UniProtKB/Swiss-Prot annotation:
It holds the Pfam family GatC. It is an enzyme of class 6 (ligase). Heterotrimer of A, B and C subunits. Keywords: ATP-binding, Ligase, Nucleotide-binding, Protein biosynthesis. InterPro entries: Asp/Glu-ADT_sf_sub_c, GatC. It comes from Magnetococcus marinus (strain ATCC BAA-1437 / JCM 17883 / MC-1). Disulfide bonds: none annotated. This is Aspartyl/glutamyl-tRNA(Asn/Gln) amidotransferase subunit C. Gene3D superfamilies: Glu-tRNAGln amidotransferase C subunit, N-terminal domain. Belongs to the GatC family. SUPFAM superfamilies: Glu-tRNAGln amidotransferase C subunit. Allows the formation of correctly charged Asn-tRNA(Asn) or Gln-tRNA(Gln) through the transamidation of misacylated Asp-tRNA(Asn) or Glu-tRNA(Gln) in organisms which lack either or both of asparaginyl-tRNA or glutaminyl-tRNA synthetases. The reaction takes place in the presence of glutamine and ATP through an activated phospho-Asp-tRNA(Asn) or phospho-Glu-tRNA(Gln). GO terms for molecular function: asparaginyl-tRNA synthase (glutamine-hydrolyzing) activity; ATP binding; glutaminyl-tRNA synthase (glutamine-hydrolyzing) activity.
């Protein structure tokens, strides 16, 4: 498939880009080659090939879903440089 200079100019206009004649000619050829490559890839036989999201077939290790006591406010506040009434106290940043 050949991408015309007019198509490149139209897409450039939509993207609010400006190309001179030389750039338009160059991009027309480059985009045509990319479209041809995608066309060739779409013609490859893929029946029986499992879809994948990663180039390497690997399993992501997952930890067990264990319910724990999440109420550890006192433990967390013990690590804070300054705390007041059960909350972190930070320096004033807005006047």
């Amino acid at each position: 498939m050949s991408v015309t200079k007019e198509t490149v100019q139209h897409v450039a206009n939509l993207a609010r880009l400006q190309f001179n004649e030389e750039e338009t000619e160059r991009f027309s050829g480059q985009i045509s080659r990319i479209v041809d490559l995608m066309d060739a890839l779409s013609k490859l036989p893929t029946e029986g090939v499992k879809p994948m999201s990663h180039a390497v077939d690997m399993a992501i290790p997952q930890r067990d879903d264990v319910v724990t006591n999440g109420n550890q406010r006192d433990t967390m506040l013990a690590n804070a440089p300054d705390a007041e009434k059960g909350h972190f106290r930070v320096p004033k940043v807005i006047e």
